[in-house]
Amino acid sequence: MAGILAWFWNERFWLPHNVTWADLKNTEEATFPQAEDLYLAFPLAFCIFMVRLIFERFVAKPCAIALNIQANGPQIAPPNAILEKVFTAITKHPDEKRLEGLSKQLDWDVRSIQRWFRQRRNQEKPSTLTRFCESMWRFSFYLYVFTYGVRFLKKTPWLWNTRHCWYNYPYQPLTTDLHYYYILELSFYWSLMFSQFTDIKRKDFGIMFLHHLVSIFLITFSYVNNMARVGTLVLCLHDSADALLEAAKMANYAKFQKMCDLLFVMFAVVFITTRLGIFPLWVLNTTLFESWEIVGPYPSWWVFNLLLLLVQGLNCFWSYLIVKIACKAVSRGKVSKDDRSDIESSSDEEDSEPPGKNPHTATTTNGTSGTNGYLLTGSCSMDD
């Protein structure tokens, strides 16, 4: 075991040339990041998850009810053993031939069977109230952590001159504010990892899981080898658009369509500007070129930059989805569907949609268009 640990913590991998772990031990004069500090993230992640449950029940839910957001979920499909067996064992989306066979077997018309399968697919999906509460929690956290990050960074020299991320590296003392910022972000991402399996499932579950893994690894990696200064820039930059996204979703669930559209436009502008403009030209420039000039490359430097390039790849993917949504919104006159959502249609739409009608333009009995306008979800921080 000792040999494995010695191999894993090899100084030649983690640290620049001629630097040892002994050089980064805490002293009375200076405190440096220590790997054991990160253990604190696990109990804090649990605490954040518990705070979320309390917040959603006692803060977000009353707000949703005050906005007349429905608490009821989709209509439950009537019990039918034959259809249930087909649904669970064969297919959730029967083709025309199977529908005709079931119609003869049950003496139901095809439209009734189609409706049953739609209701059955949707009956376990959460209500709009649940979605609103989830978005309000994320909005509140993202707003807080982004505000904290801005207030912290505006007092630091590396915000105004990124070369300060590498001056005297790795002998850069760890301040209390920086330590708090890092542990808070890491704890939140661990809580997302746990809650992703109980939250609303979306089509991009795998991509978001990968994103959370990369985020956790980047935060952990940059803390251990004391790249925390540039790490704070990455974190704050990727947090900048997330609160706007969740605000747009809340406006959508509350049926404030004009506000939803405005917030989505603001989100899209901030997201694309920060992820495709500022991040590569400012952050990647300093991690790839300024650090090479001032510190020089070493093994963990390559890994860190490869992870940042992977994050940039995810940024490009999500930017593509945002542009895709924006183009659809222009053609329809409003934002009406999240390309990453798992939603097929609203519960009302399931009952009223005639065969062959375009689900994106169908009008529900609630007076909304399409699929209640579910937007792009998730934070993309070191994110998103």
Swiss-Prot record:
Glycans are attached at residue 18. The keyword Endoplasmic reticulum applies. One of its GO terms (molecular function) is DNA binding. Residues 324-384 are cytoplasmic. Residues 361-384 have a biased composition (Low complexity). It is an enzyme of class 2 (transferase). This is Ceramide synthase 6. It comes from Homo sapiens. The gene is CERS6.
